[in-house]
Amino acid sequence: LLKAIGGECAGALEISPRCEPTLNAVPPRYQPVTDEQLTQWSVGTPQAFSNVTGQGEVRLSLAGVQDKLPVYIDDDQIFIPVAGSPSTHILKFASSFYSHLPENEAFMALLAKSVGLPVVDVHMRATPKARIAVIQRYDRVLQDGVYGRIHQEDFCQALGISPSSKYEKEGGPSLKQCAELIRRRAAFPLLDLNKLLQWAIFNWLTGNADAHGKNLSFLYSQSGAPSLAPFYDLVCTRNYKNLSRVLAMQIGGTTDPDLIGSQHLEVMAADLKVRPKLVLDVAEALLEKIAGALEGVSAKYLELYGDSPILERIPLVIRRQLRRARSQWS
């Protein structure tokens, strides 16, 4: 498995057989992608793009529920990295199980950015038959005209927890463990603790029950000091009736988003070792910001990408969640 996918991993890790030279090409090499290929991949399966170079050199190494592909983009042209060359973006294709999932992620990224969360850049790209989410990689940086890798590790990796146990109820990271990890490791722990708090509350208020330990990462600077990476994989999972609404991480001792009230936020404050007033203030401020931003974000999405069923459904789901939160506080 590592031989097949190790050339272009998340972060700066590169894995190749001991007897072979490094896969990293100098200079990097890329193969252009045609519109026909993009259309084929957008409606196909992983097998549709598993050997796109014809030489077995393309290496898919990005985990998740969607079909996705690391690519290099230059002047809006998409290329496939060859022989371990760095990618710059990730393409996420439509899911056969969850309708309009790329659009969902693009909308939620716009919403998160509008209320002040640090979030990856996500935009939509259309093919004749589908829409694709294009996510800019935060672990790639342009240096002297060439893209290089910045190392990252998600919180399951940082805590030595198997990705198969990424949910707290299965032994995955809790918010308390994440906060303790930040205090031990982060270059600026107070700044990153505040980001963690906002991330957890935003996910609760916007109906994202899939905010688990692999959706938080450290990004390492050249000095080796880690900081919390921009947030990614923000999705309104409550938009899908067949998905569990149970939170991936407890908030104040409960995983039921409909029961969370001020008493749970006070327990959350104790878990994070911050003042209860800070947590309550952040929660109230985010609730008001999200409520006030939904209409503008919907208009912005419509302007950028055109109409989509998510523009009616997701704001409705989020407004219901905000009303439930208000009722618990009152």
Model-predicted segments: where are they?
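Phosphate/dinucleotide-binding and metal-coordinating scaffold of catalytic cores
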Residues: 1-330
